[in-house]
Amino acid sequence: QGTDLQAGVSSDQIAARVLGRETQLASLELAIDGRDFVGSCDDGFSCAYTNTISWANDTTPLPMENNPRVVFERLFGDSGSTDPTVRKARLAKDASLLDSVTERADDLSRQLGTGDRRKLTQYLDAVRDVERRIQMAEAQSDRELPVVEQPAGVPGTFGEHAQLMFDLMALAYETDLTRVTTFMMGREITGRTYSEIGVPDAHHPISHHQKDPAKLAKLTKINQYHCELFAKFVERLSNTPDGDGTLLDHSMIVYGAGMADSNAHASQNLPILLAGGVAGIGGRHIMYPEDTPLANLQLSLLDKLGVPTESLGHAT
């Protein structure tokens, strides 16, 4: 509780450790809600548990970015353009800055004690990761990219915001800038409203519906809205050529929620949807035995991705 964190590496980051070796960005973590919550959020537990679903290790939650402009800059740089000439100039400038940082760090290292030198080593490891990404980007800089305008910022409605984030995810896959993304459409205990679909009430209070028909109807509207936006993303992937098929053919997509019954805070029998050619045979509804951990499914999916993993969470 409090500021003490104890979770576990998430399946997306296990995949990123392997699949991310060949791309500019190992992974991309996205969200709709901001990171305005700090301290204790739910029953005295850290807000880190509700602000993200991606964990690098037991104690390191990864921040999820909700600003489309920042996501665009992570993918294509701050030049605001996907033009190859502009991108090359920006990469050369970034590489020059990193060379300067490394030289100064080497000089500083000789003047530090053991403890400070260890901290500097950690910092330099992060610098080398940035350097690796720049080198990867330089190798790919001649590639023709779709002409895309840099987003101005966060759109005004949930639907526009979610659609833009899904589009950026699809663009990241299409350009092979990353092969692993995680998108949290709604944080736990969210107070978001959905006036554009006729639901002005906050999401979290509605989820504790106590079987009130009016609240259930509104909750159903929200769930349908989320699914419709997700379906558009899947459709876009299915319409995007990729090698001998489409992006959807070569993708594995997992869509779901952390609760099956929000009114009772029940996390058993979670509804999980799989899409994409890598996810296996579609068009099926599979009922797992009672108390089967979700981690069992995640281990199977990692294996299909070519990332065999011995254990994960409470997998049996």
Enumerate the predicted regions with their spans.
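Ligand-binding pockets and gating/stacking loops
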Residues: 1-316
